């Protein structure tokens, strides 16, 4: 029973509270309507506010202690000062507007005003005029430069001192070698001159014999006279050919000696010539001398040809016909004084016998056509 009474009381209290709250809201609403009805013109004036055109950001000290001057936000839609107290900027949103009255960084910070400028304290014992550190560096560089110059000049002096000795040695060696080459060259020229004199004497003897034979008169031209004329022409050709070959050989020898001389001079100039003497051998080209000489027998047999191979040590010499038997001999080789002169025995026919046979025939028979023997394979009779 007791609990029932308590529940009823609680229920009644709730109902009364609800009623009281409903009456209070009705009274507030009636009072608001009355106020709005009595002050309508003032509310209309407060609603029609002018549009926001600009906002000014005040000057402040940023977090680095630097002063940022004030600026105005009036560009386009960026009409509000936004950001933080240490970093401010213009924006277009009103709800992001910064309340600048709450910031405290409009005055100089305490940590910035408390610093004092650093002053360099000079040591009274230190005298900058007596500081010799730079002087030591200059002294070291100067000593190094002087040592380098001394080394360079010493090297140049040593080279200059040894140069005259080297030049004198090279000149002496070159002169000795040049004298040896000149002696060899003169010896070779003497050999060629001796050969040329021998050939010239033989040619003169041959021409004298031909003139004596031509002085004889015959009723008809003898075969011996025609053969002598042909042989004279051949001997002149042989002499010309020999002279040309001699000139070519002398030129070749001179070029060879000049090349050797130039090479030795270069070696002497370089200073690397050997100290021991060098033996230079003069090698001359060799060639064979081939000819055929007809040999006519008394009994009327066919003539036989004798081939003689003669090696000439100085130059090559060849011809088709020999004028006299003396030219069949080998050229005398006079390279050294101790060499022996060798001759190969050959069977030869005397041209005088041939001339006598042709002279005897010319008195009894009519002159025949001259027949000349050459080395060519196809012999022609004129």
From Swiss-Prot:
Residues on Extracellular side: 27-132
Protein's UniProt keywords contain Transmembrane: yes
GO biological process: regulation of short-term neuronal synaptic plasticity
Keywords, in A-Z order: Cell membrane, Cell projection, Glycoprotein, Membrane, Postsynaptic cell membrane, Signal, Synapse, Transmembrane, Transmembrane helix
UniProt-annotated glycosylation sites, renumbered to this chain: 39
First and last residue of the signal peptide: 1-26
Transmembrane domains' residue ranges: 133-153
This protein's GO CC annotations: AMPA glutamate receptor complex; dendritic spine membrane; ionotropic glutamate receptor complex; postsynaptic density; postsynaptic membrane; synapse
Topology feature Cytoplasmic, residues: 154-382
Membrane topology of this protein: Single-pass type I membrane protein
Localization: Cell projection, Dendritic spine membrane; Synapse
Primary location group: membrane
UniProt family annotation: Belongs to the shisa family. SHISA9 subfamily.
Assembly and oligomerization: Component of some AMPA receptors (ionotropic glutamate receptors) complex.
General function of this protein: Regulator of short-term neuronal synaptic plasticity in the dentate gyrus. Associates with AMPA receptors (ionotropic glutamate receptors) in synaptic spines and promotes AMPA receptor desensitization at excitatory synapses.
Descriptive protein name: Protein shisa-9A
The organism of origin for this protein: Danio rerio
Gene assigned in the entry: shisa9a
């Amino acid at each position: 029973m007791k609990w029932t009474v308590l529940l009823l009381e609680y229920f009644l209290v709730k109902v009364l509270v609800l009623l009281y709250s409903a009456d209070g809201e009705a009274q507030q609403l009636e009072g608001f309507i009355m106020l709005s009805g009595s002050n309508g013109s003032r509310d209309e004036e407060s609603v029609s506010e002018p549009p926001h055109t600009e906002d000014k950001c005040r000057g402040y000290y940023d977090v680095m202690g630097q002063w940022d001057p004030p600026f105005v936000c009036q560009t386009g839609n960026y009409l509000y000062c936004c950001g933080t107290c240490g970093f401010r900027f213009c924006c277009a949103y009103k709800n992001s507007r910064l309340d600048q009255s709450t910031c405290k960084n409009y005055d100089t910070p305490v940590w910035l005003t408390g610093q004092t400028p650093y002053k360099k304290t000079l040591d009274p014992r230190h005298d900058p005029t007596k500081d010799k550190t730079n002087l030591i560096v200059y002294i070291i560089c100067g000593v190094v430069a002087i040592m380098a110059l001394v080394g360079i000049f010493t090297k140049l002096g040593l080279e200059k001192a040894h140069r005259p000795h080297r030049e004198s040695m090279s000149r002496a060696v070159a002169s000795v070698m040049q004298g040896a080459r000149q002696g060899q060259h003169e010896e070779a020229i003497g050999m060629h001159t001796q050969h040329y004199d021998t050939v010239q004497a033989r040619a003169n003897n041959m021409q004298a014999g031909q003139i004596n034979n031509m002085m004889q008169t015959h009723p008809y031209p003898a075969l011996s006279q025609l053969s002598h004329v042909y042989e004279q022409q051949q001997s002149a050709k042989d002499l010309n050919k020999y002279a040309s070959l001699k000139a070519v050989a002398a030129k070749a020898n001179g070029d060879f000696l000049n090349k050797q001389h130039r090479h030795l001079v270069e070696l002497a100039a370089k200073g690397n010539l050997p100290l021991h003497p060098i033996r230079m051998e003069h090698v001359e080209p060799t060639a064979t001398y081939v000819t055929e000489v007809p040999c006519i027998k008394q009994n009327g047999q066919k003539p036989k040809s004798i081939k003689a191979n003669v090696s000439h040590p100085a130059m090559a010499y060849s011809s088709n016909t020999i004028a006299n038997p003396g030219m069949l001999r080998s050229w005398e080789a006079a390279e050294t004084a101790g060499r022996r002169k060798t001759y190969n025995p050959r069977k030869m026919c005397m041209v005088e016998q041939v001339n006598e046979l042709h002279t005897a025939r010319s008195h009894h028979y009519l002159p025949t056509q001259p027949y000349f023997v050459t080395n060519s394979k196809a012999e022609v009779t004129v």
